[in-house]
């Protein structure tokens, strides 16, 4: 908007809000007396979205409806419609129970903790994180593989509550309404059918230790963390109203479910699909408590997780959406990196499909998308800072398959020929 002293740039326009020139941004929108760039418009949209989210949480006595929760989950998590419905209803009922437990004393509503079962990279952790963000409650994550029974080397179960307290800035009241997500819960399954063979301090022992805090107890938490020791003051945290969400890939559970299905489907009319003919996520939909018991979870622990949400394998269409649709989508992140070099990065639609298929072949789900893109763009990102005149880099399906190099388009339109074609 303002003019610069040099004759070369006296007609350069600037954003009235951030001060960037028209050459530093994609778009500069003119008003009667001001200019605003596309980046500032995006920032304004983010602020409005955050305001809308906070107003959503404050509506209806602080409890968004299941449909409202599910709608916000759709903005962050691609696919998994069934799991979103299960989670939305469970979380809505949980916080409705908290808000009304002092109003009606005739019927006591029990807490419903949640178990998420799904393949690697299907969105279990992201769902739990997004729920906490929607509800504006303290949230912490714990890795079940690091937990051991009290008195053994490893992390005490009560340290989970300490982390939640830290997330709540040591506000005990807020922490007591928070959400705890315990990942890799399948890794603490019982290591043997006979629990008396050895002392299983990281398997069944951890399940036993988790029982109390999941059901509801007053945990004595050391304020500075670590092991308890005498002459130490403890913080008392009631875990009765803390929502526990446990997640795991449960590798091998599909075989247990399929075996149970085969035993009940016999006769000439029975249609039995081989395990390889069905996707893991589809098989998980038929999970029963008895399957979890056979997997190695103890009956008391399964009883503390009455709500089970199963996630399906992400198909090619879902993985393509994950690459491009979310606000912090991977493709947008790499495009931003290239923009810093004043170069446009373009992915052909067939290239995105090829990336998605690679992730499916590797069975890494959404988690494996970044490593695939990193390997595709490695040579380009290595060479790019030293290349002169490159205006655009195009990634085709052949580049993803490894049969061609990225197409470099130069600013001089008479020489659009690329450094590309064929290699292998």
From Swiss-Prot:
Alphabetically ordered keywords of this record: ATP-binding, Chaperone, Metal-binding, Nucleotide-binding, Zinc
One cellular-component annotation, GO: HslUV protease complex
Amino acids binding ATP: 119-126
Residues annotated as binding Zn(2+): 15, 18, 37, 40
Superkingdom as given in the UniProt entry: Bacteria
Gene Ontology biological process: cell division; proteolysis involved in protein catabolic process
Positions of the ClpX-type ZB domain: 3-56
Gene3D superfamilies assigned to the protein according to its UniProt record, in alphabetical order: 1.10.8.60, ClpX chaperone, C4-type zinc finger domain, P-loop containing nucleotide triphosphate hydrolases
Entry's Gene Ontology molecular function annotations: ATP binding; ATP hydrolysis activity; ATP-dependent protein folding chaperone; protein dimerization activity; unfolded protein binding; zinc ion binding
Assembly mode: Component of the ClpX-ClpP complex. Forms a hexameric ring that, in the presence of ATP, binds to fourteen ClpP subunits assembled into a disk-like structure with a central cavity, resembling the structure of eukaryotic proteasomes.
Job description of the protein: ATP-dependent specificity component of the Clp protease. It directs the protease to specific substrates. Can perform chaperone functions in the absence of ClpP.
HAMAP family according to UniProt: ClpX
Family classification: Belongs to the ClpX chaperone family.
Protein known as: ATP-dependent Clp protease ATP-binding subunit ClpX
Annotated gene: clpX
């Amino acid at each position: 908007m303002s003019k610069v002293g040099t004759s070369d740039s006296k007609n350069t326009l600037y954003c009235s809000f951030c001060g960037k020139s028209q050459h530093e941004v994609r778009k500069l929108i003119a008003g009667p007396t001001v200019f605003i760039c596309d980046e500032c418009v995006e920032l304004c949209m983010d602020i409005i979205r955050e305001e809308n989210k906070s107003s959503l949480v404050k509506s209806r006595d602080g409890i968004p409806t299941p449909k409202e929760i599910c709608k916000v989950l759709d903005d962050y998590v691609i696919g998994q419609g069934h799991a979103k419905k299960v989670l939305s209803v469970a979380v809505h009922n949980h916080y409705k129970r908290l808000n009304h437990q002092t109003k009606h004393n005739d019927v006591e509503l029990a807490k419903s903790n949640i178990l998420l079962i799904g393949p690697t990279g299907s969105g279990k952790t992201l769902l739990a994180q997004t729920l906490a963000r929607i509800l504006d409650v303290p949230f912490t994550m714990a890795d079940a593989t690091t937990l051991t029974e009290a008195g053994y080397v490893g992390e005490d179960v009560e340290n989970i509550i300490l982390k939640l307290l830290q997330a709540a800035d040591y506000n005990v009241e807020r922490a007591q309404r928070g959400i705890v997500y315990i990942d890799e819960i399948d890794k603490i399954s019982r290591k043997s059918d006979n629990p008396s063979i050895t002392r299983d301090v990281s398997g069944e022992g951890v399940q036993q230790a988790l029982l109390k805090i999941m059901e509801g107890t007053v945990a004595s938490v050391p304020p500075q963390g670590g092991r308890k020791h005498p002459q130490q003051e403890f913080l008392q945290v009631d875990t009765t109203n803390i929502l526990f969400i446990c997640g795991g890939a449960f590798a091998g559970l599909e075989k247990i479910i399929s075996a149970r299905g085969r035993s009940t489907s016999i006769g000439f009319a029975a249609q039995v699909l081989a395990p390889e003919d069905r996707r893991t996520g589809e098989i998980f939909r038929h999970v029963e408590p008895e399957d979890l018991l056979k997997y190695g979870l103890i009956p008391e622990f399964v009883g503390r997780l009455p709500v089970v949400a199963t996630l399906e394998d992400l198909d090619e269409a879902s993985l393509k959406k994950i690459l491009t649709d979310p606000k912090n989508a991977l493709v947008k992140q790499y495009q931003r990196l290239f923009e810093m070099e004043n170069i446009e990065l373009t992915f052909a639609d067939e290239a995105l499909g090829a990336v998605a298929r690679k992730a499916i072949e590797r069975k890494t789900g959404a988690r494996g998308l970044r490593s695939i893109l990193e390997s595709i763009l490695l040579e380009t990102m290595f060479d790019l800072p030293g290349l002169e005149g490159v205006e655009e880099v195009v990634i085709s399906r052949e580049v993803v398959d490894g049969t061609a190099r990225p197409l470099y388009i130069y600013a001089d339109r008479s020489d659009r020929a690329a450094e590309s074609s064929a290699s292998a």
